[in-house]
Amino acid sequence: MQYVFTALGLLSRLSLFVVVTPILAGWFFVWMVIATAFAWFAWLIVIIILSDVPMGEALWHWFVFWPMTITGWIIGASDWSNRTGIKLWGRKPGDSHGSARFATRKERAAFEGSDGLLIGRDLDTGKLLRYDGPAHLLTLAPTRAGKGVGTVIPNLLLAERSVLVIDPKGENAKIAGEARKRFGAVHILDPFGVTGMPASAYNPLGRLDAESPDLGEDAASLAEALVMDPPGQVSEAHWNEEAKALLAGLIMFAVAHEDADRKTLATVREYLTLPPEKFRTLLELMQDSIAAGGLIARAANRFLGKSDREAASVMSSAQRHTHFLDSPRIVAATARSDFQFSALRHELTSIFLVLPPNRLDAYSRWLRLLVAQALQDIARDAEASQTGAARLKQPALFLLDEFAALGRLEAVERAMGLMAGYGLQLWPILQDMSQLKDLYGARANTFVANAGVLQTFGVNDFETAKWLSQMIGRETTGYQTESHKPGDAPSTSYNVTARDLMTPDEIMQIDPSVQLLRVQGKPVIIARKLRYFADREFDGLYPPPDAKLAKPSSER
């Protein structure tokens, strides 16, 4: 019996199709005739009013006739479509459920200027896309996705501005070091001789002034960079804070009372590894010091006021965070200063911080120190009203590759929120959004909110893809449904709904040569990634692949 009802249903729908289709077609024809008649009537009135020549004999009559006739057809067809629900042509769904969309060709053309940082290449025209705004930038891309060849090196080769770049493998210095010399001075800080190129050094204590009222703040900033607070380890917070206080006091003492050649972090490490009785003597000397407005004496009193057990834990924490200073390579790299970070604002200067990936965990505090020092120096220089030196037109660029290796650094977080107007642009580069959230928690949004450009490619984890999908937004899309009831004409309806402009799985399936760019205040851009070794704009700016570089010395 079920098959009988199925057959009858099919026969009914077929009969309705055969009967209803001519009716709908006739309805459409009648509607078109009526609309055309109204158009002709309007045309006739125009001819009668404006012309004394018989209808159709003047050429301009026809220039009036056809537009009116076509307009009548369009009106009639549209009305018929609305009444029947049958879609005749592309119908715009509106934006009631979302207005997200991709950037148009005209909107992308705004980024094809000759100035600014390179962010990609237009898919249609092949022209370079640049960002010339003052805001910071942020890149999310997994390892081996092309961050170096597509983001870091292209900008190092062409950006005529001061640059500080974290260079984990030394490849950026090898490839772009010579090219940067045409802009200005180049300093490569390479404690482990990865690049085989002449290495510079920087002493974080070198610019501290014992007579400055800012000595306490400067020492605290260095201590903050030395002590890494692992995310989620609340139990370590007290010991780390006390270790910072002790380190700040020891740094101030070294600056105020040591000879010039001993005003280094190596001396601070030497203090921390003294035998207990000698360290006690050092603390007593600090108590007698009147330098730094009494801050040195206060630091000693604070430590001596602790119980033996608490003091031992604080001492252990301070020693742990300065263990990297036992390396002769790091000692040599921090023994003198070949430049000042404030020069980044006044002279075209390039600084490469080279640390091999296999040493990032052990020596990341060295990177933290230098980045924190650079940010503080630039901020101080910008605030110094007495300086007469002219500032460079373009802001200094901080390309912070392997950003997560720095750990949570308050100086960077403050810079993302406050220092865009100080002649500084930060460009943190991370593997995924999880890295940023692990380090900064809810305050990770500070980085996203202050990024004028968000660049993403090669996304292969669902959480980052989901976050991107939500951030890109939703579009309003339309769809048509048909329903059939026995004995009734088919019913067609047009509906609208919301859809992610790009779903997480679509983001994860993007071609490896393509990237997403979200520029502040603009629709999302789909662009091609750059490849310095294959793109003609970079020809002749870097050494050929077979160029022989000096091998790093085992003694450096």
Q: What is each model feature region?
A:
Residues 2-145, 149-152, 195, 204-205, ...:
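Basic- and hydrophobic-enriched, low-structure N-terminal and domain-boundary segments
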Residues 4-7, 11-23, 27-36, 124, ...:
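P-loop NTPase motor domains
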Residues 416-516:
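Conserved ATP-driven motor cores of ASCE-family P-loop NTPases powering translocation/secretion/packaging/pilus
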